[in-house]
């Protein structure tokens, strides 16, 4: 647990340009979101794992409400739930991507993108009944998101014509020729997962490489 807390503290100081970018390729066009890795590591790690496994390929934006949000990722069977993760600096404003859920700590794979500011969905704002963790923001192609938001739907908010995620891919992976040393001639002490448990290198899984000079690198090996 101490390792996990330390990871959160260390990653809170990482610059924005180190954060993961994800490309959505849909039948309406393409857009990119940038994840808040350092602020909500559990949520982003869960999303990255799903993306890396191809979980969302062929999934639909199955719920669309104009001037509100577009929701996707309803794939069966759903993965295990994750703990809600909130940061006071994040809010459900226009362009942000957030976890969909049916109550506290019930999020799994479904998410939505805010078409407008929906700050009442924040954990720390009235009416305090809806709590949806923000974990990223659309950085390009938001016009495509808006186009999806304008599709015709039935009375259940389901698009008449399927809006398909043809593929969803990590677009900003870091690669290293030598994972066991860094540019400062430091040595690798251990590799841990998002929960701080010591492990060994896995493919398509976010891991944290801890070096003897105190540096921590998040690496996803392909």
Language-model features and meaning:
Residues 173-199:
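Residue-level detector of functionally pivotal "anchor" positions at catalytic/ligand-binding pockets or at interdomain
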């Amino acid at each position: 647990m101490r390792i996990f807390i330390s990871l959160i503290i260390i990653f809170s100081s990482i610059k924005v340009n180190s954060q993961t970018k994800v490309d959505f390729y849909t039948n309406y066009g393409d857009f990119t979101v940038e994840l808040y890795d350092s602020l909500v590591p559990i949520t982003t790690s869960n999303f990255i794992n799903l993306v890396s496994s191809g979980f969302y390929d062929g999934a639909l934006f199955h719920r669309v409400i104009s001037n509100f949000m577009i929701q996707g990722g309803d794939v069966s069977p759903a993965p295990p739930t994750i703990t809600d993760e909130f940061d006071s600096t994040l809010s459900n404003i226009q362009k942000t991507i957030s976890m969909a859920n049916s109550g506290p700590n019930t999020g799994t794979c479904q998410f939505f993108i805010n078409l407008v500011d929906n700050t009442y969905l924040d954990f720390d704002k009235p009416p305090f009944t809806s709590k949806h963790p923000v974990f990223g923001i659309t950085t390009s192609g938001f016009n495509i998101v808006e186009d999806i938001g304008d599709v015709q739907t039935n009375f259940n908010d389901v698009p008449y014509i399927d809006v398909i995620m043809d593929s969803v891919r990590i677009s900003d992976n870091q690669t290293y020729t030598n994972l066991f040393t860094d540019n400062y001639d430091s040595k690798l002490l251990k590799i841990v997962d998002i929960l701080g448990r010591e492990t060994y290198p896995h493919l398509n899984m976010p891991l944290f490489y801890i070096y003897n000079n105190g540096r921590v690198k998040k690496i996803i090996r392909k």
